[in-house]
Design a protein with these regions (language model features):
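Predominantly the C-terminal beta-signal and adjacent terminal strand-loop region
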Residues: 121, 147-215
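Transmembrane beta-strands of outer-membrane beta-barrel pores
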Residues: 28-36, 74-82, 111, 123-131, ...
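Outer-membrane beta-barrel channels and translocator barrels
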Residues: 15-21, 60-65, 112-116, 164-168
Length: 215
């Protein structure tokens, strides 16, 4: 199965300068849109959104004409997909919630282009620490209970390039997640165990263009 769509998002970041070039940074990202589903039939315009929050600590290191800033921290990602309704083949959909706690490890490279502009590149690896998947199968109206699974294997990658001039910034980004198969949980129908269910391995690729204002 696959889901594809377009989102609009908002990023907020704040940085506090500490001693000896160290810094503390907080990030908050919200993205909202809709996706088209292909799998057990097709369905279009399913609401889909996520929110991501992180706390990072790092240190700036001047090297020649550039600044390298390695960092690490703790992040949380929540994704919601509303697939309720009937697909083109008559399959019933349901809501899904993904919860990830992860360890971000990355490095920022900053290079001055002139007195007013600089190029900033960021490369990050995200190690999944804990994940929980909630499948609200009761939405399908077939007597099934909701399913809760844990996902503890996976990783993410983030790459971005920003051209900054004065207080403005613009540039492309790519985000990727690869999450392993979950554990199995007992599946109930009308309160009676009828089998087991799990969340299959999945991956997410997100790319786009970011524009920002610093103040």
């Amino acid at each position: 199965m696959s889901s594809k769509g377009v989102k609009m998002g908002l990023d907020l970041s704040t940085t506090s300068v500490l001693l000896d070039g160290q810094f503390l940074r907080g990030d908050l990202r919200y993205a909202l849109g809709s996706v088209d589903y292909t799998g057990s039939g097709t369905a279009s315009a399913q609401p889909d959104w996520y929110v991501e929050a992180r706390v990072l600590i790092g240190k700036d290191r001047a090297i020649n004409d550039a600044v390298l800033s390695p960092y690490f921290g703790l992040g949380y990602r929540y994704l919601f997909n509303d697939a309720r309704g009937i697909t083109s083949t008559g399959a019933a959909g349901y809501r899904r919630e993904s919860n990830y706690i992860y360890l971000p490890i990355g490095i920022i490279h900053r290079m001055a282009l002139n007195d007013q502009a600089q190029l900033e590149s960021t490369l990050e690896y995200d190690h999944l620490l804990a994940g929980k998947q909630v499948s609200q199968l009761s939405d399908a109206g077939l007597g099934y209970g909701d399913l809760n699974n844990t996902q503890n294997k996976g990783y993410g990658l983030k790459l971005s390039i920003l051209y900054k001039k004065d207080e403005w910034a613009v540039g492309p980004f790519v985000h990727y997640w690869n999450i392993g198969k979950s554990d199995t949980a007992i599946l109930f129908r009308y309160g009676t165990p009828v089998g087991t269910g799990w969340e299959p391995a999945n991956n997410t690729l997100e790319f786009g263009l970011k524009a920002g204002l610093q103040f």
